[in-house]
A protein has these predicted regions:
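Nucleotide/pyrophosphate-binding catalytic subdomain
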Residues: 1-193, 197, 287, 362-364, ...
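Terminal amphipathic helices with adjacent charged low-complexity linkers/tails
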Residues: 1-12, 209-226
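Short glycine/serine/threonine/alanine-rich loop segments
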Residues: 76, 147, 205, 270, ...
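Glycine-rich beta-alpha junction loops
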Residues: 156-158, 205-207, 211-216, 226, ...
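Conserved beta-strand edge residues that scaffold enzyme active sites
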Residues: 83-85, 156-157, 214, 279, ...
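Short hydrophobic alpha-helical runs that function as membrane-insertion/retention elements
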Residues: 149-153, 207-209, 273
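A conserved regulatory-domain signal marking ACT and ACT-like small-molecule sensing domains
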Residues: 218-385
Length: 385
C-alpha cells in the first residue's frame, strides 16, 4: 500500500500495483469459498484513488480488507477500527472513549473482527499506529474487554533466546515476564511490538505468541511471574547507534551540566538511549537515524554553550543480555566480557539497569552478527542460558 501511495502521489501509473493487491484479496475470498462480494468493495475503493488520497486511509486498507475477509470466514461481526479505536487530535489514544466503544460493540455482537493498525480522530480521519501496530490494537482490545489472555498469532513459534539467523539453534522461550519481553523487543527481538505489552501488563492479562503455521505449538507465554529459569532469558541486539562523547574538565562538579546537555538533544527531537559517564566525560548514545541530520549542529551547540569538546563515535551496535534471574547472581558480567575477549571483540560501552534485569554492551557494528552468535554459544556453555 505504501508503494501504491508513492505512485499516486507522484502521478506514476499504478494500475498493475492495484490489480496485484486487489487480485490477492479476490483470490483468498475465492479459495475460501466466502460469500462476501469483496470485488465490489475493492472496485468501489479503487474509484476513490487519486493524487490527493489520504495516505493513512490508503495504507490502512490492507488491514481493513483482511479483516473483512476474516469476519466472513469466521462468521463474526466486522467492526471497523475507525468506529471504536479513537485518537485525540494530538495523536494520543483516547482510552476512555475507545474502551466504551469497544465494549458497546462487543455487547451488541458478541464476537468481533476488528482490523488492527489504525483508528480515527474525532472527525473520522484515519490515524495510524506505528509499523507493527496491529499488535497494539490487539493488546488494547484485550484490555478493554478484560480478556483472560491475548493470543498473538504470527509466523514464528514464539520467542527464541536469540535471533535464529545469528545463533545456531537457539532455545525457544516457554515463559517470560512482560519486563523481559519489553527489553528484548526494544533491542531488536521483533516478534511483538514493544508498545503492545504495557496495555495488557497493567491489567495482568497474559500474552501467548503462537504460530499460524504450527497451531499445535504452545509458543511463548508472557506473564507477570514466569517462575524459575536460567539466569539469562535471552539476548538481542540492534545496530544504528551513534555516541556523542563529551569532554570537559570538572564537569562532575558542575551542577546542571547533564541537564543542559540533554536539553540540546531534546531541542532537536532526539530521544536519548543511554548516558555512560566518567569524571570528565559523558557519552550520549542515540539512534543515528534520529541524529543524522543534526550531528554538526549538536556538536557546535554543545561546544559553544557548554565549553566542552565533542567527538562522535558512529556505527555502534548495542547488545542486551536480559534475564529476570540475573539479579544477585555473581559472575554473569564476567562471563559476558570474557566471551567477547576470547573472540577478539572490544567492548566500548557497558550499561546495566538498576534492577539488574539487563546488561547492555556496545561494540563496533561490524562485529554485531558474530558477537551475538559467540555470546549465545558462550552463555549456553557456561550454563547461564
Amino acid at each position: 500500500m505504501y508503494t501504491l501511495d508513492g505512485h499516486l502521489r507522484y502521478g506514476v501509473p499504478d494500475d498493475k500495483i492495484w490489480d496485484s493487491i486487489a487480485g490477492r484479496y479476490t483470490e483468498i475470498a475465492k479459495s475460501l469459498g466466502l460469500s462476501i462480494d469483496i470485488d465490489a468493495e475493492l472496485r468501489a475503493f479503487a474509484k476513490t484513488l487519486g493524487k490527493n488520497t489520504d495516505q493513512s486511509l490508503l495504507v490502512s486498507r490492507g488491514e481493513y480488507f483482511c479483516a473483512r475477509l476474516m469476519s466472513a470466514y469466521l462468521g463474526f461481526a466486522f467492526v471497523d477500527a475507525a468506529d471504536v479505536i479513537r485518537f485525540s487530535f494530538d495523536g494520543r489514544l483516547d482510552l476512555e472513549t475507545s474502551a466504551r466503544l469497544v465494549r458497546e460493540a462487543f455487547d451488541s455482537h458478541g464476537s468481533l473482527v476488528v482490523p488492527g493498525f489504525y483508528g480515527a480522530y474525532p472527525n473520522g480521519d484515519i490515524h495510524l499506529f506505528s509499523r507493527g501496530g496491529s499488535d497494539i490494537t490487539g493488546s488494547y482490545l484485550a484490555r478493554f474487554l478484560n480478556a483472560e489472555i491475548y493470543e498473538n498469532w504470527t509466523d514464528v513459534s514464539g520467542i527464541y533466546s536469540a535471533d535464529p539467523r545469528l545463533a545456531k539453534n537457539p532455545k525457544p522461550i516457554e515463559r517470560i515476564t512482560y519486563e523481559e519481553l519489553r527489553e528484548l523487543s526494544y533491542m531488536g527481538a521483533n516478534v511483538l511490538h514493544e508498545d503492545s505489552i504495557l496495555p495488557v501488563q497493567d491489567c495482568g492479562i497474559a500474552i501467548n505468541i503462537r504460530n499460524t503455521n504450527e497451531p499445535d505449538n504452545d509458543g511463548t507465554v508472557i506473564t507477570r511471574d514466569a517462575g524459575e529459569g536460567t539466569p539469562v532469558t535471552g539476548i538481542a541486539g540492534k545496530k544504528g547507534f551513534i555516541s556523542f562523547v563529551i569532554h570537559k574538565k570538572h564537569m562532575s562538579g558542575e551542577i546542571g551540566f547533564l541537564r543542559k546537555v540533554l536539553t540540546v538533544f531534546e531541542g532537536y527531537g532526539i530521544n536519548v538511549e543511554h548516558i555512560p559517564t566518567g569524571m570528565d566525560v559523558i557519552s550520549v548514545i542515540v539512534l543515528e537515524e534520529q541524529a543524522a541530520r543534526h550531528v554538526h549542529a549538536i556538536i557546535s551547540e554543545i561546544e559553544s554553550t557548554l565549553g566542552a569538546q565533542v567527538t562522535v563515535d558512529r556505527n555502534l551496535s548495542l547488545i542486551a543480555i536480559v534475564g529476570r534471574n540475573m539479579a544477585g547472581r555473581y559472575g554473569i558480567s564476567a562471563s559476558v566480557f570474557g566471551i567477547f575477549g576470547q573472540n577478539g571483540i572490544n567492548i566500548k560501552v557497558i550499561v546495566q539497569s538498576p534492577d539488574e534485569l539487563n546488561i547492555i554492551v556496545g561494540i563496533d557494528a561490524e562485529h554485531h552478527e558474530r558477537a551475538i552468535g559467540c555470546l549465545y554459544d558462550g552463555l549456553c556453555t557456561a550454563g547461564l542460558l
